Regions:
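Fold-independent oxyanion-binding glycine-rich loops
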Residues: 6-9, 32-34, 66, 90-91, ...
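Short glycine- and Lys/Arg-enriched binding-loop motifs that mark or flank ligand-binding interfaces
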Residues: 86-87, 118, 122
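Catalytic-core segments of thiol-dependent peptidases
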Residues: 83-104
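Active-site-adjacent pocket-lining segments in enzyme domains
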Residues: 97-101, 106-119, 126-211
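N-terminal beta1-alpha1 cap of cysteine-dependent amidohydrolase-like domains
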Residues: 1-85, 89
């Protein structure tokens, strides 16, 4: 599986995505559950904006809500198997992680991670969730238990062996907290990579190397 890891939206390497579409297909699921704790207007606006950009890249976008699959991973596996591209957008990384767990999307991603011809696009929270641990983000995102009581999850998906720190040295309203996060990773000897808005890391985890 290819991981297209971005800081803000889809970054400066969208030609890579266009080439991927040519070699595979253009159908993609858009997952916005990281925004579930936000107001409805913000959720709607963010989804529409991201759909527009993905359409311009060449994708045919279907929006899916992980809440529809809570406690029904069998249905998620069946429905998601019709696609081999998934886009997970930003918001609160702890809310996103809970939605992934309750729906079984986390296990689904791990299952297909070593298979060819799959694409995961993640930005902001959608990229942060890919690492091993999420505890370092508790000063940037509030670790709220959104869907169930006492359900905060501090373990990431573990699809990469480093922590992604987005919005580094960028025009971001919490940029001062990002600097603190970098310092914390250094102090606690946590492996990390920073991304400025616009920058992208592309990982081929089927081959265990960065593209």
């Amino acid at each position: 599986m290819i991981l297209y890891i971005s800081s803000k939206q889809f970054g400066y390497q969208t030609d890579f995505l266009k080439n991927w579409i040519m070699k595979n297909n253009n159908r993609i699921l858009l997952i916005a559950n990281a925004l579930d704790a936000k107001d409805e207007m913000k959720i709607k606006n963010n989804i529409e904006n991201d759909k527009k950009i993905l359409n311009e890249i060449g994708f045919e976008v279907t929006v899916v809500d992980l809440k529809d699959y809570f406690n029904n991973q069998e249905k998620l596996t069946k429905d998601f198997a019709l696609y081999n591209a998934y886009c997970v957008i930003g918001g609160n990384v702890f809310v996103l992680r809970q939605a992934m767990k309750l729906s079984g999307f986390d296990n689904y991603l791990k299952k297909i991670s070593k298979e060819e011809n799959y694409l995961y696009i993640g930005y902001s929270a959608g990229s942060c969730v890919l690492g091993n641990e999420l505890g370092t983000f508790n000063k940037v995102d509030e670790p709220i238990s959104f869907y169930l009581k006492d359900n905060v999850i501090y373990e990431g998906l573990g699809l990469i062996n480093y922590t992604v720190i987005p919005h580094y040295k960028s025009d971001y309203h919490k940029v001062h907290l990002i600097d603190d996060l970098v310092k914390r990773c250094i102090d606690e000897d946590i492996k990390f990579k920073t991304l400025k808005d616009g920058e992208v890391i592309i990982e081929n985890i089927e081959k265990d190397n960065e593209v």
